[in-house]
């Protein structure tokens, strides 16, 4: 189906991971190989949905990461269960891969992002060895909701570096974003009582590192880019 991932192997041959519908009507990820990039032959099915993770699968990716192998894809029509939400998700199967037998062994499954419009991930390998991911910030179902007179509508995420720790994928903004940082503002040892305003933090774009000490509270909220009528809130 949509967006197979093709890459060139070290020996000059080509591999592709694709997705399809299996006999039970749910998704499957298949591996194909080619000597010239034109004539392809089927190798194996890497993973099957078995009606556990949505129905149709899209946008597959298959790559090594920190000693593990990752199969990342976007399931459609998922039901909310555990960390997964309804509709479109992006999930990663983390495990091992035997290149001799082309056998992928799944060890863990995780959601890549909790945003309901996060979709269609793709990764690339940077020259320095970093695995970098991009994705949509808006799905097709929202394309008719653009404001009147809007010249463009939709964007992709800031690229993220991927790493594996304790069997899960961790994501951080690419280090190149450090080059666009402006003035730095520090607040330390702040005791928060009710609503507290920190001076010097303003604007629509900010890179924040916030450390919160445990205390006698059940939740706290950060309000960003706030004016009299609007704000963005993050609640933990």
Language-model regions, residue ranges each:
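Hydrophobic core segments of beta-strands in well-ordered, beta-rich domains
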Residues: 1-24, 29-32, 42-45, 50, ...
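Short, solvent-exposed loop/turn segments at the edges of secondary structure
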Residues: 1, 26, 57, 87-90, ...
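Residue-level signal for well-ordered, solvent-exposed loop/turn and beta-edge residues enriched
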Residues: 38-41, 168
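Structural motif
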Residues: 24-30, 79-94, 158
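Surface loop/turn signatures of beta-propeller and other carbohydrate-active proteins
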Residues: 1-8, 18, 40-61, 78, ...
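Beta-rich accessory regions
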Residues: 96-117, 122-236
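Short loop/turn segments that connect beta-strands within beta-propeller blades
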Residues: 35-38, 98-100
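Residue-level preference for beta-strand/loop junctions
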Residues: 25-26, 54, 204
């Amino acid at each position: 189906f949509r967006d197979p991932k093709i890459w060139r192997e070290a020996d000059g041959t080509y591999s592709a991971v694709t997705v399809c519908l299996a006999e039970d009507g749910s998704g499957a990820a298949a591996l194909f190989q080619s000597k010239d990039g034109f004539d392809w032959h089927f190798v194996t099915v890497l993973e099957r949905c078995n009606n556990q993770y949505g129905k149709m699968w899209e946008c597959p990716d298959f790559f090594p990461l920190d000693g593990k192998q990752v199969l990342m894809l976007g399931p459609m029509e998922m039901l909310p269960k555990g960390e997964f939400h309804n509709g479109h998700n992006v999930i990663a199967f983390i495990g091992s891969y035997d290149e001799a037998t082309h056998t992928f062994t799944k060890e863990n499954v995780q959601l890549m992002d909790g945003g309901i419009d996060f979709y269609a991930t793709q990764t690339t390998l940077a020259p320095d060895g970093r695995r970098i991911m991009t994705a949509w910030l808006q799905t097709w179902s929202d394309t008719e909701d653009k404001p009147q007179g809007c010249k463009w509508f939709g964007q992709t995420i800031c690229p993220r570096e991927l790493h594996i720790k304790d069997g899960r994928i961790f994501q951080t903004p690419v280090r190149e974003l450090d080059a666009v940082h402006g003035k730095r503002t520090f607040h330390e040892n702040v005791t928060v009582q009710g609503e507290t305003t920190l001076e010097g933090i303003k604007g629509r774009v900010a890179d924040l590192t916030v450390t919160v000490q445990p205390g006698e509270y059940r939740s706290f909220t950060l309000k960003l880019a706030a004016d009299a009528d609007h704000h963005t809130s993050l609640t933990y």
